[in-house]
Amino acid sequence: MSLDYENDSALHQELITQVLSQYPHKAAKRRQKHLSVASDREAVGEEGETLSECDVKSNIKSIPGVMTIRGCAYAGSKGVVWGPVKDMVHISHGPVGCGQYSWSQRRNYYVGTTGVDTFVTMQFTSDFQEKDIVFGGDKKLEQVIDEIEELFPLNNGITIQSECPIGLIGDDIEAVSRKKAAEHETTIVPVRCEGFRGVSQSLGHHIANDAIRDWVFDKADGKTDVEFETGPYDVNVIGDYNIGGDAWASRILLEEIGLRVVGNWSGDATLAEVERAPRAKLNLIHCYRSMNYICRHMEERYAIPWMEYNFFGPSQIEASLRKIARHFGPTIEERAERVIAKYRPLVDAVIDKYWPRLQGKRVMLYVGGLRPRHVITAYEDLGMQIVGTGYEFAHNDDYQRTGHYVKTGTLIYDDATSYELDTFIERIRPDLVGSGIKEKYPVQKMGIPFRQMHSWDYSGPYHGYDGFAIFARDMDLAINNPVWDLYDAPWKKMTVPTAAVAAE
């Protein structure tokens, strides 16, 4: 289902001019490249698909002193890619703060006994002190690894997530990794994800992907897992971090159409799933931004094709299932159609219930990796309209992909500052804003409903057909919550009769 609507291009262009007028000339010139309005849609491709132009600059270093909403390379590696691998211990190598303040913030669900065979929600740090900066921390790192192997013998590997001081003082974590891996006969992966590298968490994703290539795949080449037998319908689900159980909801659908998910990266993942990934027949990538690097490597090195899919909302679920099924042929295509038909009554019931309550409601999005585009059609499936969307750390190809989703006149903003985002929201007054925890409370103080689209506001899953029902319920609860009727003080709502005023 695709809604036919256009946004107010003139208003959105006026808003861009307004926010730029408040900057000094040099800053305004730089920020102008990051703000745009989606231009007219044109027909592209054999199926007549329409495409909007989202012409903004991206993946550029933020201006110092201007508050933006980005993270660092350490956040991209440890917090996104490696952290959810459940049977490995992930050391935050450096001062305690980075690990402490990022401890268990992402809702990466997993199955296992924490502290015994799974370690996702635990925080391990080398707790760098001043003397470690002066004399180096390699010996301390060796001691930390020894202690982990003694205290947690059921771990299947260790990653070393280096923080800023490690790169600045030049510690050789690679040498320590090789030494201790041989000594303990285990996998130890050094990740050079110091926070000062790159312009955002996006480089941390890339570095983490490279670490998988260099320290997992290359080490495993030539080795065969005799317990793992390949099949014709083996797939890897890559870039799904199981926020609120998303990966499990996606896996249900893929298995129902006849595929076997042999690895899920990296929500609820094990090291073994990562190691055997090159033996799958197809890589299905959900978060393109964070995991396209390793998919491209596997395509070049192991000839494994990859495709992007989207399980947000019934329109994209159906399109993705059919696209995936076409890769495997008539048998899987037939099963995919049966699965789509099976869930159609559920979809119809959800839409019948929530469409009257949500139709025409306007939404602004500002999130990370893929959600500023992937969730658009899920909102439209409920009759809602996207008036603005943007990314914290996107690259140019992300905005090219966004053109397939947005309508003409949509406000586009990259690496938005707090001032820009607040101004856009205050002037547009959407019915709902979907963004992160830092934006949640300022938006609610404006009297505008909000949903946290990084962690689903502690709800979920939002993937799959079951997830769509939860998604619709949550959007309805946010927008139609009676609390918004209490936002204005009673005395501001009161109207005093003219006659009464005259009598006084």
Curated annotation (Swiss-Prot):
UniProt-recorded Gene Ontology molecular function terms: ATP binding; iron-sulfur cluster binding; metal ion binding; nitrogenase activity
Reactions catalysed according to its record: N2 + 8 reduced [2Fe-2S]-[ferredoxin] + 16 ATP + 16 H2O = H2 + 8 oxidized [2Fe-2S]-[ferredoxin] + 2 NH4(+) + 16 ADP + 16 phosphate + 6 H(+)
Residues the entry annotates as binding [8Fe-7S] cluster: C72, C98, C164
Cofactor comment: Binds 1 [8Fe-7S] cluster per heterodimer. Binds 1 [7Fe-Mo-9S-C-homocitryl] cluster per subunit.
Record's keyword annotation contains Iron-sulfur: yes
InterPro entries per record: Nase/OxRdtase_comp1, Nase_comp1_asu, Nase_comp1_CS, Nase_Mo-Fe_asu
Superkingdom, taxonomy of origin: Bacteria
CDD domains: Nitrogenase_MoFe_alpha
EC number, as in UniProt: 1.18.6.1
GO annotation terms (biological process): nitrogen fixation
Positions annotated to bind [7Fe-Mo-9S-C-homocitryl] cluster: C287, H454
Enzyme class name: oxidoreductase
Keywords attached to this entry: ATP-binding, Iron, Iron-sulfur, Metal-binding, Molybdenum, Nitrogen fixation, Nucleotide-binding, Oxidoreductase, Plasmid
Cofactor: [8Fe-7S] cluster; [7Fe-Mo-9S-C-homocitryl] cluster
Annotated Gene Ontology cellular component terms: molybdenum-iron nitrogenase complex
Family listed: Belongs to the NifD/NifK/NifE/NifN family.
Subunit structure: Tetramer of two alpha and two beta chains. Forms complex with the iron protein (nitrogenase component 2).
Function: This molybdenum-iron protein is part of the nitrogenase complex that catalyzes the key enzymatic reactions in nitrogen fixation.
Protein's UniProt name: Nitrogenase molybdenum-iron protein alpha chain
Organism whose genome encodes this protein: Sinorhizobium fredii (strain NBRC 101917 / NGR234)
